[in-house]
Amino acid sequence: MANQPSVAVAHLGCEKNRVDTEHMLGLLVEAGYPVDSDEAFADYVIVNTCSFIQAAREESVRTLVELAEANKKIVITGCMAQHFQEELLEELPEAVALVGTGDYHKIVDVIQRAEAGERVKEVSPEPTYIADETVPRYRTTTEGTAYVRIAEGCDYGCAFCIIPHLRGKQRSRSIESIVAEAQQLAAEGVQELILISQITTNYGIDLYGKPQLAELLRALGEVDVPWIRMHYAYPTGLTPEVMAAIQETDNVLPYLDLPLQHSHPEVLRAMNRPWQGQVNDQIIEKIKTALPDAVLRTTFIVGFPGETDEHFEHLCEFVQRHEFDHVGVFTFSPEEGTPAFDLPNQLPQDVMDARRDRLMALQQPISWQQNQQEVGKTVQVLIEQEHPGSGQLIGRSPRFSADVDGLVYIDPGEAPSPRLGSLTPVQITDADAYDLQGQLVSQ
């Protein structure tokens, strides 16, 4: 074991990619490979790439080029490896291996073959693999939080999205498998589980013949983890059964991440979104009625081909009317291989940028107002960082999810400092459009 080459991982992209990274690290550690946190000292650098939009690809390419210039042995994994197989091998002679999105569990074998002098290409044309609770995992998140992937892949065909091509068809894990992993994480002291997949509300449809998210949430309610949070909930999948499960399961937070993408029926139809534009107002009102304390996050795409001034004004009015807690806005990115790539009436980048900036400016006072309502409350905060000099603590309250929302900055005062990764009561004293300020409450 002493002669095993060392490995570092450069992680790029989404939290689904992060779970892949963590499983690769877990498998390598189990096989006796030393993992180095500094790429400069590692024999091999695994670059887990993202290929979702142009900006993500550019970041992946920059990372690969920097490592190639440093003469590193590079193992390219993730969505870009799935997407641009031959191009990457041709352009980067330093790449000793290429591993697709459905093949990351073979990482130990790939490194062994590369060590023997083979240039490895391990890419399944149609990814079908999904790791379960038996696959080793080395977590890279803060102590208190873990992502739990409940399904992989997607059966929809949204016009702008390359993900089904890169990740394959939907395949769900069993409820028993997910609960077993949740129990393992609870035993490690994890306080927050974030459930992820491409479409969380479609969970189980491939395995059980119908969506089983409500049943999964109730099963996870038996696990000793204080916070369970969902990402990527499609509005049409928020059935009365799912709403009831959120309402009645104590550790499931009333936090909904809804990738709405637009409000205008014509744009939604052009996007080939599953609800074809029939939604959005009624569903938002239903959610707010069923879950009055719900925190709503959403994302929108501006500048989709053919989006008119009228379409955009419709979206602005929609955002002002519904007063979401958190909004992310992206400009349309034409992805080769998707139907939207060849659509007529593509908008200039400066028009798209201006629309994004205007929509974000409209949202800012709404987010400020929503955060102001927290001032004076005492809330549970998951402590994630401590400033070494000032002792200031940084964490998240239930209304903030990891990496995408705001933070709570805490003056420790005279109270003893809580452990990183623990939940502690904090009185909120101030707020801006993004973050909260607070003080520890003596216990």
From Swiss-Prot:
* UniProt remark on cofactor binding: Binds 2 [4Fe-4S] clusters. One cluster is coordinated with 3 cysteines and an exchangeable S-adenosyl-L-methionine.
Where does this protein chiefly localize?
A: cytoplasm
What's in the GO CC field?
cytosol
Catalysed reactions listed for this entry: L-aspartate(89)-[ribosomal protein uS12]-hydrogen + (sulfur carrier)-SH + AH2 + 2 S-adenosyl-L-methionine = 3-methylsulfanyl-L-aspartate(89)-[ribosomal protein uS12]-hydrogen + (sulfur carrier)-H + 5'-deoxyadenosine + L-methionine + A + S-adenosyl-L-homocysteine + 2 H(+)
Q: Which SMART domains match?
A: Elp3 (SM00729)
Kindly list the biological process annotations in GO that this record carries: tRNA modification
Record-annotated MTTase N-terminal domain positions: 5-116
InterPro entries with a match to the protein in the record: Elp3/MiaA/NifB-like_rSAM, Methylthiotransferase, Methylthiotransferase_CS, Methylthiotransferase_N, Methylthiotransferase_N_sf, NA-bd_OB-fold, Ribosomal_uS12_MeSTrfase_RimO, rSAM
**Record's subcellular location:** Cytoplasm
Domain named Radical SAM core is located at 140-370
Q: Which PROSITE patterns match?
A: MTTASE_N, MTTASE_RADICAL, RADICAL_SAM, TRAM
For this protein, the record's Pfam families field holds: Radical_SAM, TRAM_2, UPF0004
EC number(s) given by UniProt: 2.8.4.4
One GO MF annotation is:
protein methylthiotransferase activity
Domain named TRAM: residues: 372-442
* Keyword list, A-Z: 4Fe-4S, Cytoplasm, Iron, Iron-sulfur, Metal-binding, S-adenosyl-L-methionine, Transferase
Q: Look up the record and name the cofactor or cofactors this protein needs.
A: [4Fe-4S] cluster
Any coiled-coil ranges, and where? Answer: none
Residues annotated as binding [4Fe-4S] cluster 1 are 14, 50, 79
Question: Which residues does the annotation say bind [4Fe-4S] cluster 2?
Answer: 154, 158, 161
Would you identify the family this protein belongs to, as annotated? Belongs to the methylthiotransferase family. RimO subfamily.
Q: Function, please?
A: Catalyzes the methylthiolation of an aspartic acid residue of ribosomal protein uS12.
**The protein's name in its UniProt record:** Ribosomal protein uS12 methylthiotransferase RimO
